[in-house]
Amino acid sequence: MSSKQTIPYIVNQEVNVAASLAIQIAMKKNYPTFKLYKVSSSEYGFYIDFYVEDKISSNDLNKITKEIGKVIAGGYNIDLLEKNSSEVKEILKTKKDWSKNTFFKINNNIFTSFTPDEKNIEYFKNTNKIKKVVLTKIGGVEYEDEKKQIQLVRINASAFISDDSYNSFEELMNELKARDHRTIGEELKIFLLDEFAGKGFPIWLANGHFLKEKISTYLKKEFNEYGFSLVSTPILGSKKMYTTSGHWDLYKENNFSPIMIDNEEFLLRPMTCPHHILVFKSSPKSYKDLPYKMAEEAKLHRYESSGGLIGLERVRAMELFDSHVFCTRDNIETIIIELNEMILKTMSYFNIEIDRVDLSLRSDEKNKYFDDEEIWETSQTMLRNILKKFNYKTKLSKEEIERREDLNKHTNLNFLKRWLKTEKDSYEIEKLEVEGEAAFYGPKIDYQYKTNLGKWITISTIQLDFLLPKKFECEYKDKDGSTKTPVLIHFGVIGTYERFISVLLSKTKGFLPFKLLPTQIIIMPVNNSFHLDYALEVKKLFEYNGFSVKLDDSNERLSKKVRIAQKGKIPIQIIIGDKEVESWNKKPFDKKKQEKFDGDISFRGYGEEDTHSTSLDKFITILNNFSKD
């Protein structure tokens, strides 16, 4: 397993059920028009969706919390109702979407709550067993009621049975805040979310664009080395194309409404698979052309409800480095081994630890998947056998170990360890089989990353597809001259840029891998009148050596320049003053005559107060060794 440390906090479902009932009692008492629509568990507690005529905002949370406290102190008895009771049956006649709920009677009134995942749960019999309820968030959510869209209020909450559980929760929330990619993205000027541009449509700022380009450059190089061709396809596609693929019928609610052009309907594409299939079909293929590999940096659009949008994690416009491989059945194992190698290599490059590899299989509800029992059995067995061959024990590379050892020799550069890989020298990746997570067209291998907050995220995927090539009548000529249908492998090495960058920001708390930083070094002359000329020459030297450098030639005091550099989490902060200028041999930097340029610098690391002095030549040598890939 990886070395990640997560904060121990276990959600207590019994107390959250009781607290959801206490909130309903408090709301009914204080808001006569209160009408419950939904109550559901959430990652850290639960939420309720309801309607009230009054306008409710975050300003009302303190008032509602006090009323909940009165309900808890009031010691209301809670009686569990049987599902087959006449009272519950009567409610379910009009509330069919509550069929999986649990029902209770309190003071002769019937209330409902979510049914916990745990079995043999012991429900609270009185509200006074609740120690504390915290309302964490309030917002709006749209709901379709009798074919009308109505605006509901959603309150998220967490409940506790002890001070210890609340303290663990508080610790977790503080860590969540410190790792919130939205806050980090704003501080580092990575991206912008402006509702005037539209909810769920992120705007990449200059630093974010730089970061994306760094990731893109690496991926293009890797995909080229593994024999992929880059293609480019339109962001619109005909509705009939997505109807043929099945994406329209199966995921209609995740698509934007069709656009009518010249009496034909078009969709903002939600994925590139159909376009890439058309690329494959554009010319005759034989077995000699397989495997046929293509990739694309594709702009995609998928509909998400406004309540489901979360920073870069859940958006409506996204960019995916999407790739597909068309191959014979005999190619499958070789290709998957190759793609697995690409994933592990890529994650290592970006300092991401894969924690678990899932074999995602179909569930017993076979009507959700394409109907071919033999292919499903064959493909699932095939992936299972391939996974057994993978040895998921990883260790640091020789270069990374040497990098650590080199830094240890230079105590004044200890601050740079923050930008090293953080995992142990070696760890083992867990393997798991998960039913019900297959795509409708075939089984898949999902690579899972566990955040420092204990949340699982699918970071990479390899998906087998026997269906779409048939639907689009893809074919190739085999060795014996017969016509065969190829197998399609869908491959996502990092998922979307948006999700991947949100993971990077959260994982590192904004201390991105050194090689990805928009600004690795900042140079700050104390006084432009006396120190700027040397600062400019130093900047040229670092840029010549491949570093991303910023010169702060503003007229601000040095103390303010340092504060700005600290806020931007810039690792190396170089200060040019009288002493440094005096050390300069007054020769300008010339890349053709680099040896003639010489001088000293003073520098401090992010988070450090001490300043160190060194020669430019020595500092460049150390940094080149530290930052090499």
What are these regions (language model features)?
Residues 16-28, 378-389, 542-544:
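A short, contiguous, amphipathic alpha-helix enriched in charged residues
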Residues 38, 80-82, 232-233, 396, ...:
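A structural preference for short, hydrophobic beta-strand core positions in alpha/beta folds
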